[in-house]
Amino acid sequence: MFITVQSETCNTPVLPIKNGFVPANLNHNCNLLLRDSYFTPKSAKTQKIRTARELVEEFLEVGVAQRQLSPKTAQQYRNQLYTFLDLWLLDDLKELDRENAELFRELLYQMPKNPNKDKRLHGYKGIALLNRNEELGGDVISRRTVKKFINLLSTFFGWLKSRGHVDENPFYKLKVRKALSNDRRYQLSNSDLTLIFTMRDYQSRNFLHPYYYWLPLLLRFTGARLNELCQLYKSDIIIVNGVWGIRICAKSNGQRLKNDNSMRFVPLHHALISRGFLKFVESCSNERLFGELPLVNGYYSHNASKWFARRRKTLGLDKGKDAHSFRHSFVDELKQKGVAIDIIQELVGHSSNSTTTSVYSRSYKPEILVSAINKLDDSHVAAIKPYAM
């Protein structure tokens, strides 16, 4: 099939293009359109040799451009990948095999925790940094952090392999030691929940910002991630088949999701409705529910996370119990109350491990989801009065 097109960048008629392929935007250099094919065969391409750091930057740029990474996450990944390069030293990443990957994993167990915050470690890199931290008897990163580091490297090398920069992914399915109990995030106990919801501000009904009142309650009764709640718009509070709930999505400005499975509908627990959540939503003058929370490094949860960390310290909650602990408690409580695991997965935005469930089934009806949500115990919030507008 042949077509003739006219270029917008010159007056010369363009010769027919083979296979009927015409670029969507004709504002190209005429020479491109005069060729027989818009594509360049692989054998005709010249591979530019990039340094390891250039490949890291390209990997991060692609992630940000495709909205897979926020600027904040990209910077965290940059720091980790540069830490890896400081240890590897060689510029040719093709030289890294499985044995070297295993060696790097062992070195990670000796990696100092927050080296930038310890002035005694400033100026040290690579092996010298590890040795200096050992001399000082400094803390090392947790096994959970090691696992995340290895997962990042596996993603990076998978990306390199898909683009022909390396021949193998030496970090693929590389096992790490199981996390120690003190490395894990903990669930919130009944006594923890009682402490949180009997804070003085809940008793006095004196809140500096609306999110001081609503975020702990929403975390408790939705199982959502902190940023998913901080980024909510009024238009995200919807009614489906007579059931009020929260639409967690990334449709509006500044919203982001962890992954595709995160998009979901979470019904409102009766404890939220009875305390005036719908009236609060209606009263918001801002399109966002918590307009007082600014976007910081791609996340609306920045200030709220710091606020809850201060609250945790004031309450004397154990290390490892943070805003994300509500999510762990949500999952465990519904599981203990006999709610089917695939219903729980749908409520929290986790993918199903079952091919049958993930491929052939549709979402649960709202009335089934709200029935599960309302199994959550609300005795801890019994003394909390409705929100005063």
Protein language model features and the residues they cover:
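Basic, Lys/Arg- and aromatic-enriched nucleic-acid-binding interface segment
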Residues: 133-151, 166, 173-226, 230, ...
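Catalytic-site neighborhood detector that most strongly recognizes the C-terminal catalytic loop/helix
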Residues: 252, 295-296, 348-381
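Non-catalytic DNA-binding core/recognition domains of DNA-processing enzymes
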Residues: 68-87, 94-159, 174
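N-terminal helical hairpins
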Residues: 1-54, 58-67, 73, 121-123
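Conserved tyrosine-mediated DNA breakage-rejoining catalytic core shared by Y-recombinases
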Residues: 231-275
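Active-site/catalytic core of tyrosine-dependent DNA strand-transfer enzymes
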Residues: 193, 252, 267-318
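Short, polar N-cap/turn motifs at the start of nucleic acid-interacting alpha helices
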Residues: 237-240, 318-319, 339-361, 382-389
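C-terminal catalytic core of tyrosine-transesterase DNA break-rejoin enzymes
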Residues: 214-217, 221, 325-351
